[in-house]
Amino acid sequence: MGSKQPYLNGAYYGPSIPPPPKAHRSYNSPGFGCCCFSCLGSCLRCCGCCILSLICNILIAVAVILGVAALILWLIFRPNAVKFYVADANLNRFSFDPNNNLHYSLDLNFTIRNPNQRVGVYYDEFSVSGYYGDQRFGSANVSSFYQGHKNTTVILTKIEGQNLVVLGDGARTDLKDDEKSGIYRINAKLRLSVRFKFWFIKSWKLKPKIKCDDLKIPLGSSNSTGGFKFQPVQCDFDLS
């Protein structure tokens, strides 16, 4: 018979298990390096966002300040409307051929009066269009220029060429009357892009509407005008 096992009093769980060795964290491990770079990248992104936000806030503040300053100067000076006149006009040719092509040669001389004492005007775009009835037949461009305060500027324009112009029944009737009298009723419109200057501050671009209607211009080659001469006309100025 085999040898007897010694008597065990109570439960027996086997030999004790030693605790696992403590893990030592290495600060040179790849995991720790990635954490550092990740934190650094987050800080840089955060700083970049803060800088961009600061720049945007500064630009907005500057724009608001300039806008308020321009408004204050506008309210102080209360600029008067610039006045436009057709001072003289010469119609050298105005005739239709059988194909409804209008042959024209029109000289329009404008006088522009800036009545303001402290406000100058930049004319960035300046074009003149001639109309017969409601049909535009030609145009001319003027080079950009600056008009000082309390200044009168004379602009000479020439609208010349040929163009297809189809007139309605009413305009055809008017044309027959004009050909008979030798005096033609022509309208002119000015297309402008202007900026006002208050001291060192310039306004935003404005596009006023200038209409010079019902210009009665004698045809130069006509002998039926009875000595009629062109009379200066003030144009309508609309800044709305």
From Swiss-Prot:
Bilayer topology term: Single-pass membrane protein
Residues carrying covalently attached carbohydrate according to the record: 109, 141, 151, 223
Keywords: Cell membrane, Glycoprotein, Membrane, Plant defense, Transmembrane, Transmembrane helix
Residue stretches spanning the membrane: 57-77
Subcellular location: Cell membrane
Residue stretches in coiled coil: none
Tissue note: Expressed at low levels in roots, rosette leaves, cauline leaves, stems, flowers and siliques.
Record's GO cellular component terms: chloroplast; plasma membrane; plasmodesma
Extra remark: Plants over-expressing NHL2 develop leaf necrotic lesions surrounded by chlorosis.
Name this polypeptide is given: NDR1/HIN1-like protein 2
Protein's organism: Arabidopsis thaliana
